[in-house]
């Protein structure tokens, strides 16, 4: 059956959408084989336009919005950068409103962005969690305890472990649903965002370990401690304001849920 009537019904006037959003939407719809709802298109556009207004868009170097698309293939279309490699996820793991869920054993994404691709003292990694793991697991990472590793890990129900091109591991608060993120602006401090709060920690940088960052686990020259959490967004890149990113991603996920 022709998709033309569906596409006409879901047409958004081009001038309402950010140019980068139009490109992203076209690629997602091509992967899905179908048009997106008006509300999803506008949510994507508002997110991109808002990130540009906040001055954080250019710092995002590798990212996927793991929500909104009609199919898993569409969800893995990169917002920015190279597409991730899907290792073992299937369509049943994907929910348009809440994102992609791991199984804690075999399923992960290779971001295809090397941990050393961003400057040692200007970088961030971020995830939007819809559901948390219940056991110690890596959410995103390259390395483990080696100097220059970068990671976000659930340690237990009361704390998290984080590194960002670091010489040592920092213990943070328990991971909660929403944005879980780290940024680094200099050689001595990292900022950790969780539960709507940003806390700065003393943490000395090191030459970034040369491994691709994995999502739903850490790349320790192979998959290490994968997670069963569910994520609706990830971002990797240069330093940015985590509070601004948090606000934009939260609005994005809420708008997608309301549009479907």
Label every model-predicted segment.
Residues 2-260:
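Polar, enzyme-active/binding microenvironments
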């Amino acid at each position: 059956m022709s998709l033309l009537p569906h596409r006409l019904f879901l047409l958004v006037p081009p001038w309402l959408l950010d140019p980068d959003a139009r490109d992203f939407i076209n690629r997602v719809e091509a992967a899905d084989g179908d048009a997106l709802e008006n509300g999803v298109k506008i949510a994507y556009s508002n997110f991109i336009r808002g990130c540009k207004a906040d001055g954080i868009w250019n710092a995002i170097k590798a990212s996927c919005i793991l929500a909104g698309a009609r199919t898993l293939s569409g969800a893995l279309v990169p917002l920015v950068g190279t597409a991730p490699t899907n290792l073992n996820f299937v369509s049943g793991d994907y929910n348009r409103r809440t994102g992609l869920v791991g199984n804690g054993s075999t399923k992960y994404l290779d971001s295809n962005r090397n941990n050393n691709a961003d400057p040692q003292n200007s970088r961030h990694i971020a995830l939007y969690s819809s559901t948390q793991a219940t056991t110690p697991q890596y959410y995103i990472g390259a390395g483990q305890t080696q100097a220059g590793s970068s990671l976000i890990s659930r340690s237990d129900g009361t704390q998290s472990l984080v590194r960002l091109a670091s010489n040592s591991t920092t213990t943070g608060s328990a991971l909660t649903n929403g944005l879980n993120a780290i940024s680094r602006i200099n050689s001595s401090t990292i900022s950790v965002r969780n539960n709507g709060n940003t806390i700065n920690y003393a943490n000395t940088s090191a030459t970034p370990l040369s491994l691709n960052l994995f999502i739903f686990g850490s790349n320790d020259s192979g998959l290490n401690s994968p997670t069963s959490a569910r994520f609706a967004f990830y971002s990797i890149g240069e330093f940015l304001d985590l509070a601004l990113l948090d606000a934009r991603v939260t609005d994005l996920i809420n708008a997608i849920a309301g549009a479907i």
